[in-house]
Amino acid sequence: MQADRSMKMGHALNPFSTSAPLDATAGPSLIPDLITRIPWPRWTLFIAILAAGVLLVSCLLCVICCYCHRHRHRKQPKDKETVGLGSARNSTTTHLVQPDVDCLEPCSGGDQQWGRLLLSLEYDFGSQEIRVGLRQAGNLKAEGTADPYAWVSVSTQSGRRHETKVHRGTLSPMFEETCCFLVPPAELPKATLKVQLWDFKRFSEHEPLGELQLPLGTVDLQHVLESWYQLGPPGTTEPEQMGELCFSLRYVPSSGSLTVVVLEARGLNPGLAEAYVKIQLMLNQRKWKKSKTSSKKGTTTPYFNEAFVFLVPVSQLQSVDLVLAVWARGLQLRTEPVGKVLLGSRASGQPLQHWADMLAHARRPIAQWHHLRSPREVDRVLALQPRLPLLRPRS
């Protein structure tokens, strides 16, 4: 009985006694069992393992390269010089290595607070003209952002002034505009180039941003120059002002109606009397249509608020010039033009921008203040300035 029990117990223990060797041999066969259970061919598994290894090695190499690069960068000497504005300011060639204006940090000194201006100067001894290229400005001083534009003039030509277009929302405008001034060689030593930068305000006084006064007698004009110049504070002496005129423009392409609303004027000479505004349309440099406002007496800020409608087909917009002129009776009891504003494809600066805004926003009135310019200067531009192609408004 005991033997039978032992035999039964032995037979009962046999499965457990053989389980130990089975567990011992299960470890080495675990990986092959997993491989056989994956429903992929073996060559795809080998490729996946190889790709993972290459990716891991690449990551390690990238980490090592970044560490070496930072280590070398820290050990570079800091006494190396870079190409800056000082070395290029007195250069006499146009092939200058100029840094990007946006990368220049303003210095703590007072000389840097008004910004910089990049100019190119070229004098033609044959035509006796100096060609001024207004390239760009940088680091202009303003609260927040600004809408800068520039006036360019030469002291020997009173009343002659070039006005750039307005650049919206920037302190580093790219002008890229060129203007010419007639300066005989005998007048070069005493001539001064003046560039004034302004912050455009549509319905208020424009704010000065800085000024450059460059005596041409100190510049070597035997070669083409392109240099950076430091802007100074705005001058205390204001340029000759003939007043300002505010009016709105509205164009409807479907009907071809151009509406001009003369609103008001300000800053007129106190010695003038009975001021009024003439509106004149010119087609192909010939007088086409005209009208005028009522006269306002005894005021330097006359208020008109009078509207005028002209029929101008879309096909004739490229050939039309709009001239608004303030007339007044002076001390000699003779009515003369005080100043003019030219709009159209022959205009420049703010008037050209106003005309373009009218075409871009058809059927909507666009109002703006404009500085009056010399009547002689406007008449000269009408005769000489080539037309600029403008986009036609959508009907």
Swiss-Prot record:
Domain C2: 113-229, 241-370
Record's keyword terms, sorted: Cell membrane, Cytoplasm, Cytoplasmic vesicle, Membrane, Repeat, Signal-anchor, Transmembrane, Transmembrane helix
Extracellular compartment spans: 1-44
Membrane disposition: Single-pass type III membrane protein
Protein name: Synaptotagmin-8
InterPro entries associated with the record: C2_dom, C2_domain_sf, Synaptotagmin
Keyword Protein biosynthesis set for record: no
Origin species: Mus musculus (Mouse)
Family the entry assigns: Belongs to the synaptotagmin family.
GO biological process: acrosome reaction
Tissue expression profile of the protein: Ubiquitous. Detected in testis and brain. Expressed in primary neurons, neuroendocrine and endocrine cells.
Matches recorded under Pfam families: C2
Main location, first listed in the record: cytoplasm
Assembly and binders: Homodimer or homooligomer. Homodimerization and homooligomerization do not depend on Ca(2+). Interacts with SYNCRIP isoform 2 C-terminus. Binds inositol 1,3,4,5-tetrakisphosphate (IP4). Binds to AP2 in a Ca(2+)-independent manner. Interacts with STX1A, STX1B and STX2; the interaction is Ca(2+)-dependent.
Biological role stated in the UniProt entry: Involved in the trafficking and exocytosis of secretory vesicles in non-neuronal tissues. Mediates Ca(2+)-regulation of exocytosis acrosomal reaction in sperm. May mediate Ca(2+)-regulation of exocytosis in insulin secreted cells.
GO molecular function annotations of the record: calcium-dependent protein binding
SUPFAM superfamilies registered for this protein in UniProt: C2 domain (Calcium/lipid-binding domain, CaLB)
A GO cellular-component term linked to this record: cytoplasm
PANTHER family per record: SYNAPTOTAGMIN, SYNAPTOTAGMIN-8
